[in-house]
Amino acid sequence: MAKSRILKGDVVKVIAGSHKGQIGPITSITKDKQWVSVQGITVKKHVKPTNEDSEGGIKDIPAKLHISNVALQDPKNKDQVTKVGFEIINGKKVRIARKSKTQIKTAK
């Protein structure tokens, strides 16, 4: 299993599936299964009440998308998606957007 080049906080665009075309930052990554959650993308799920306090019903929960179904949004040209490359700048390895050759800011 290859290491993911997309990190938490990166702004991505969904390129496949029922949520195709939606854009948002990554809120969580499950590396072993290669799933990501993107802010603003939810699915409706029926939830049964567990005890007297909680209510059941149809709830919106964060959708888990496979990492291959999202692509990084180009930081320079927001309409395009790009692949991630690496370059050594001032002795540090930094992530680069391959289409625009701009450095990708890492969210912390």
UniProtKB/Swiss-Prot annotation:
Top-level taxon in the UniProt lineage: Bacteria
SMART domains according to UniProt: KOW
GO cellular component labels: ribonucleoprotein complex; ribosome
Physiological role: One of two assembly initiator proteins, it binds directly to the 5'-end of the 23S rRNA, where it nucleates assembly of the 50S subunit.
UniProt-listed NCBIfam families: rplX_bact (TIGR01079)
PROSITE patterns, per the entry: RIBOSOMAL_L24
Assembly and binders: Part of the 50S ribosomal subunit.
Annotated signal sequence range: none
Keywords: Ribonucleoprotein, Ribosomal protein, RNA-binding, rRNA-binding
Zinc-finger among keywords: no
Annotated family: Belongs to the universal ribosomal protein uL24 family.
UniProt-listed GO biological process terms: translation
One Gene Ontology molecular-function label: structural constituent of ribosome
Protein name from the UniProt record: Large ribosomal subunit protein uL24
